[in-house]
Amino acid sequence: MANKKIRVRYAPSPTGHLHIGNARTALFNYLFARHNKGTLVLRIEDTDTARNVEGGAESQIENLHWLGIDWDEGPDIGGDYGPYKQSERKDIYQKYIDQLLEEGKAYYSFKTEEELEAQREEQRAMGIAPHYVYEYEGMTTDEIKQAQDEARAKGLKPVVRIHIPEGVTYEWDDIVKGHLSFESDTIGGDFVIQKRDGMPTYNFAVVIDDHLMEISHVLRGDDHISNTPKQLCVYEALGWEAPVFGHMTLIINSATGKKLSKRDESVLQFIEQYRELGFLPEAMFNFITLLGWSPVGESEIFSKREFIKQFDPARLSKSPAAFDQKKLDWVNNQYMKTADRDELLDLALHNLQEAGLVEANPAPGKMEWVRQLVNMYANQMSYTKQIVDLSKIFFTEAKYLTDEEVEEIKKDEARPAIEEFKKQLDKLDNFTAKKIMDAIMATRRETGIKGRKLFMPIRIATTRSMVGPGIGEAMELMGKDTVMKHLDLTLKQLSEAGIE
C-alpha cells in the first residue's frame, strides 16, 4: 500500500443537505489528496432507497463546490472507475455476492424480521448482547437446501449473510486512533451483505467500491469504527488487501459538551443554512478544517493553498472537536474585512431583498446607496444577514427613543448638545459625512460640551442606537430630512419627560 498512488474518496448518501460533519470529512479527504498530489473520488452511496431524498445528490455537489472542494472523478464528471453511484453498480455487487455464495462464505437467510426481533428480545432478557444466531446449526447440506426451498415456496424473500469466522481478531493501525482490534465474536454474528430487495448493504458495497476504485486511504468519522471489522471480514473473504483507515473524532457542541446531533437545534449544522446567512465559503472552509486538525504555529486564518501545503493526517486530533459558533462568527468577520466588496454587496443585497427592505431590481442610485450601506457595516458584521437588523433605522419611520436610550441620554448634557447640533445641521447645504462631522465640532465649540457627553446624545438622537458605524457616514446615508425628524422627535420626547 505504501507505494500506491494516494486515492481517497468522499462518499455521501443523498439523504439531505450537507452537514457540518460530512463537510469536514470531504475537506480532510480533499486536503489529503491535494497535499499528496493524489486523486479525490466523489461517490454517491444511494443503496438505502428509503432514506434517499430527491435532489439530495445535486444538493451535496452544489454545496461542496460552494465550499471550494473539487474532485477528480465522480458522477458529474466521470472517470475510469465508474459508475460512481452505487445504485448503478448492482450488477457489480451481484458478481461478488455470487462468488461468496459459491465458495460457501455466504448463505441465504430466510429468518423474518419478527423472528429476529424475538431472538434479540430473548437475548436481552438473558443479559446477552443481541446477535444473530446461525439458523442452520447442525443441519446437513441437503437439509439446508430443503429448508431454503420450503421458505421460497412460502413466498419468503431471503437476505444474504456472510459467515463470520470464529476466533479471528480484526485489527488495523488507524492513522488517527492508533492500533485498534475487535474479536470476531463481538461484531454481532453473521451480518447481512444483501438485502431482501437485492440491494447490497453498506458494509458490503463500500468494500467492493473501495477495492475496485483502488482507494488507498479511508478517512471518515469515528462513528464508522464499528463498521471497520465487518468490512475487514469482507476483505478477507474476497482475498483483498484493505486500505489504510483513519477515523476522525466526533464534533461536539461547545456550549453543551454533547455530540453535535442533527436533533440539536441550538446550533445551525448545515452548510446551506450558513450560505443563507451570508457566511463566506473561504471562512467556512477555514473554520471546518480546524475542527479536529491542528496546523503548525498559532495562526488561525489560512488560505486554501496554505492548508494544502500543511495538511498532515498525523495532526488530526484524538480528542473531540468543539464546534463554537462564536469562533465561527469571528473567523467569518476576519474574512469579511478583506473580502471583495462586490461579493459582500451581492450577499447583503440578497438578505435585504429577502427581508423586503430593498426592491428586486433597484435603480442605479439605490444600488450605490446599498453599496455604501454594506461598506459601512462590513467590518462590524459576522455575516451579511446581520445587516437586516443593523440597518433597520435606515428603512423605518422616525420613532421615539426606547426607555434605555432615554436613561442613557439623562446621564449627559443632552438637550443643549442636541439643540445646537440641530442648528448646525440646518445650515448645511451639502449633507456629507465630512460636513456632518464639522457640524459636531461646531457644536462642541458653541456649547463647550465634548467627548462622550457630546457624541453619545447625538448618536442616540439621530441613529436610535448607542453603538454603530461612523456617525457621519450613518447620517449621510439616512439623509438630512430623516435626521432632522429624529432630532425633532427626540427634543419633543425630552420635553415630555421633563428633561431640559
Curated annotation (Swiss-Prot):
HAMAP family: Glu_tRNA_synth_type1. The keyword Ligase applies. It is found in: Cytoplasm. Monomer. It holds the Pfam family Anticodon_2. One of its GO terms (biological process) is glutamyl-tRNA aminoacylation. InterPro entries: aa-tRNA-synth_I_cd-bd, aa-tRNA-synth_I_codon-bd_sub2, aa-tRNA-synth_I_CS, aa_tRNA-synth_I_cd-bd_sf, Glu-tRNA-ligase_bac/mito, Glu/Gln-tRNA-synth, Glu/Gln-tRNA-synth_Ib_cat-dom, GluQ/Sye. A motif ('KMSKS' region) lies at residues 259-263. The keyword Nucleotide-binding applies. Its main location: cytoplasm. ATP binds at K262. This is Glutamate--tRNA ligase. NCBIfam families: gltX_bact. Its EC number is 6.1.1.17. Coiled coil: none annotated. The lineage of its organism: Bacteria, Bacillati, Bacillota, Bacilli, Lactobacillales. One of its GO terms (molecular function) is tRNA binding. Catalyzes the attachment of glutamate to tRNA(Glu) in a two-step reaction: glutamate is first activated by ATP to form Glu-AMP and then transferred to the acceptor end of tRNA(Glu). It catalyses: tRNA(Glu) + L-glutamate + ATP = L-glutamyl-tRNA(Glu) + AMP + diphosphate. A motif ('HIGH' region) lies at residues 12-22. Keywords: Aminoacyl-tRNA synthetase, ATP-binding, Cytoplasm, Ligase, Nucleotide-binding, Protein biosynthesis. Belongs to the class-I aminoacyl-tRNA synthetase family. Glutamate--tRNA ligase type 1 subfamily. One of its GO terms (cellular component) is cytosol.
